[in-house]
Amino acid sequence: MAPIPLLRRLRRGRPVVVVSGLPRSGTSMAMKMLEAGGLPILTDGLREADGSNPNGYYEFEPVKQLDKQGDTAWLAEARGKAVKIISFLLTYLPESYDYQVVFMRRDLGEVVSSQNKMLDVRGEARGAGDDRTSALYAQHLEQVERFLRQRPCFSVLMVDYAAVLADARGQAARINALVGGHLDVDRMAEVAEPALYRNRRALL
């Protein structure tokens, strides 16, 4: 999480703030915190809030085309803003930009449980068994974290979902430090809602 050298910053412009992680790992909560803190966000609002994500999804449709060699010109607009990009798409980001990545981590059993509940609500079939899915996710996260460490265009902060709910202000301060220290940490902490933490393994 070393600071970006001045010459590199002058050449490439402001970094893109990326909120990433597995689906249902707290990425929307992190986006909401950044927005509340005063950071501009890049979202189109096409996917509306629902029972699974009452605060909204904070998605941006062009992101979904990254693995299809879609147009990445929108990244120029994303400099100095936060955009949500799930972990499966991080490896497709061009290295001609700098990225400050807030990477959300959550207990994998809770992630799978939350995903299953969302699929049930939608009436969609579940995929592999829970243990198999958790193992695949663990392998994927290891690969992605290795990828991020090996590329100087990424500055990464790992943020634990449960830690945000236990100490929202402390984690907000860490996120604020990553992105330059100009956000309202108190406002960030206020929007982290423990009431949304519905899928703790102890309650399953």
What positions do the PLM features span?
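PAPS-dependent sulfotransferase catalytic core
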Residues: M1-R79, E193-L204
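Short, surface-exposed acidic
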Residues: L42-L46, G180-V191
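PAPS-dependent sulfotransferase catalytic domain
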Residues: G80-D184
